Each structure stands twice: as C-alpha cells, then as structure tokens.
Design a protein with these regions (language model features):
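Iron-sulfur cluster-binding electron-transfer modules in prokaryotic oxidoreductases
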Residues: 1-235
Length: 235
C-alpha cells in the first residue's frame, strides 16, 4: 500500500475523532497506508497554526508550522504526500505555510498536500462503492471553494449508484472559524446562513444527508438548525 501522512487537525482530533477513524478505514480500502507523524523529542500535538493566523498572530502560527516541518521532514525526504480532513488546515499547507516559510520542504508540501477527497479521487477505481438510494446536500467550505476543491467531492459522490447529489450554491456558511460566535458578528453570521444554506436544508426532509467537510460549517448547521451534517469520510 502507498504510505501517506495523515495530518489530524485539532478539531477532528478532539471533537470528532470518529471522522479520523473513518478516514483511516476508507484510505486503507483505497490502497493507502495512512500514518500520523509525531515530534520525536516532544509529546506536543501538531497544529497547522490556523487559529493563530485567523487572529493575526503570525509568529505563533510560524512556531506551529516549524513543528510540523520537524515531524514531517523524514517523510518529505521519502516523497510521501500529505492528506488532511479539515479544509482550512490542510490547505494552509498549500498557501500560508509556503508563503511564510520559504524552503524546499514547504514547496514540497505546497505541491503534495491534498484534501481527503482529492486524494481518494486518484484511487477511485480501486474503491468499491455500494449503491445507496438517498439524496445528499453538499456544502463546500470556503477554502475548498477558493482552491476549486469542491469538484472532487462531487465526482466521488457521483460514482455511488442511486445517490442524488445537490451541491448547495452558497457563499460562506457564516461561521467562518469563530466569527459566528462573536457578540458583534453573530447577526451577520445568521444573515449569511439564512441567505441560501439554511433555507435549502429546511426545504429537504430529515432523511436527506448534509455533507460538509468544514468543522465550523457543521457547527453552524447544528447550532442554527439542529441538523447533523457529516464529513465525507464519515458518510
């Protein structure tokens, strides 16, 4: 099996570890051997620094990024790719990290880091899809949209016989990290969610599955509508 670094972000690690377990199982069935690197001289949990970046704490974010490089270095030298579940985290490997730290290693990460579905689509011929007579609503995370990374999810879902896929034509869900939790920004967050995302979900019955790879998107849907949205890996 082809080895691949699985970058486990803070949100999925602590709040939805079932997504990580599901991703590992799916990746194995697709012919990959996912593994989770750690720092050799520390028990510190790796973080991409996204939460620091979102608050302008660049130096703090760079420290987290340097830890990732230390942990990944032996595997980067072997030409092993990286896959992640949280779009805003894994896509920082293609954007913020190589822009803030300019080395051959970060350039490698820029060109060899993939979202879960981007990696799976490469091996889709090896995956045995079960037929499912269901409808799913797909909400793309803002980072996925910015990197044109929603299409791979659609392509994978369309390989499942009997599955009806509707890609909700939305902008941001309104949560935007912690934006939707702010006292001064809550109303704006709700207005954004009620533009298209919430109405589309409410138009569909509860047996329609909502797929959203972004943790903040799933939280917005859960808090705003009391509907469970799932990561593609769990679906």
């Amino acid at each position: 099996k082809m080895p691949v670094i699985l970058f486990v972000d803070t949100f999925n690690r602590y709040y939805e570890p079932e997504n990580v377990r599901s991703a590992i199982n799916v990746l194995k069935k697709a012919g990959y051997y996912p593994f989770i690197p750690t720092l050799s001289n520390s028990s510190k949990i790796l973080c991409c620094g996204r939460t620091y970046l979102s608050n302008g704490l660049i130096d703090n974010a760079k420290k987290e990024m340097l830890d990732i490089l230390d942990a990944f270095r032996p595997y980067i030298k072997q030409g092993i790719s990286v896959v992640g579940l949280e779009p805003s985290c894994i896509l920082s490997f293609r954007d913020e990290i190589p822009n803030l730290i300019k080395t051959e290693e970060t350039e490698y990460l820029k060109n060899n880091s993939y979202t879960f579905e981007e990696l799976l689509i490469k091996k889709s011929k090896k995956i045995k899809f079960r037929s499912i007579n269901k409808k799913v609503l797909l909400h793309g995370h803002c980072h996925q949209k910015a990197f044109d990374a929603v299409k791979p999810i659609e392509n994978l879902l369309n390989k499942i016989e009997g599955l009806e896929v509707e890609n909700i034509q939305t902008s941001c869900c309104g949560m935007a990290g912690s934006f939707g939790y702010g006292k001064d920004t809550y109303d704006i967050s709700m207005k954004m969610a009620n533009e298209r995302l919430f109405p589309t979900i409410k138009e569909n019955s509860n047996d329609v599955v909502v797929i959203a790879d972004g943790t903040s998107c799933r939280c917005q849907i859960k808090d705003g509508l009391n509907r469970e949205a799932v990561h593609l890996a769990k679906f």
